[in-house]
């Protein structure tokens, strides 16, 4: 029988291969343990998030107004107050005054946007009335344009009529109305309620931004509103 004798070199190669196999096995075990640890971590995290979500939903439910009656036992009934409280919280989250205190440019843009929105609202209302009466609106536009210019609003002049560059809807109303409409859509089906919520949004926005006008040359939104109303009344009173 032939006896096979391994040379020292072959023995070293086999030993190295065995060592490599053991190292690979150890690496695989370590990797498996790491994957398991990560998996357990995500399971634990998901569980905690679920608990927080359930807790939040319970808190939200407890804050909802309930009406109990024979036809709707235990059914939550939304009220205007619930929607308005949500809109107020949304406005607080936007934090207009906080952002303005940190950024002078933001504060200036906010003041201009608010006064431009006041200008646009009054212009549209009065122009629609004057046009319906067949009255030329050019003199009215010239006068309120001059008032807007005197208020410090930037803009352009065309055909002797100054128009604020930021003329348009109040930019803060849309986020409030949109978020409330998304959360409570059935409360916005009625047009009367839509108008009511818009008026409320304008009111709380004006209250929020009022302090931004305390230390500037611009009139407050209320003062600018009065200036434009006086101009409009002069033309409206002359309508037949």
Curated annotation (Swiss-Prot):
It is found in: Secreted. The keyword Secreted applies. GO terms for cellular component: extracellular region. The record marks 103, 109, 124, 131, 174, 194, 198 as: Helps stabilization of SopE-CDC42. The keyword Transmembrane does not apply. Keywords: GTPase activation, Guanine-nucleotide releasing factor, Secreted, Virulence. Residues 166-169 are annotated as: Core-loop involved in conformational changes in complex with CDC42. GO terms for biological process: actin cytoskeleton organization. Residues 78-240 are annotated as: GEF catalytic domain. InterPro entries: SopE, SopE-like_GEF_dom_sf, SopE_GEF_dom, SopE_N_dom. Residues 165-172 are annotated as: Catalytic loop involved in contact with CDC42. One of its GO terms (molecular function) is guanyl-nucleotide exchange factor activity. Induction: Transcriptionally activated by InvF in association with SicA. Changing residue 124 to A/E: 160-800-fold reduction in GEF activity. Activator for both CDC42 and RAC1 by directly engaging these Rho GTPases and acting as potent guanine nucleotide exchange factor (GEF). This activation results in actin cytoskeleton rearrangements and stimulates membrane ruffling, promoting bacterial entry into non-phagocytic cells. Also activates MAPK8, indicating that it is capable of stimulating signaling pathways that can lead to nuclear responses. Chaperone InvB is required for secretion and translocation of SopE. Belongs to the GEF (guanine exchange factor) SopE family. Encoded within a prophage region, which is only present in very few Salmonella isolates. SopE-expressing S.typhimurium strains are associated with severe epidemics. This is Guanine nucleotide exchange factor SopE. The lineage of its organism: Bacteria, Pseudomonadati, Pseudomonadota, Gammaproteobacteria, Enterobacterales.
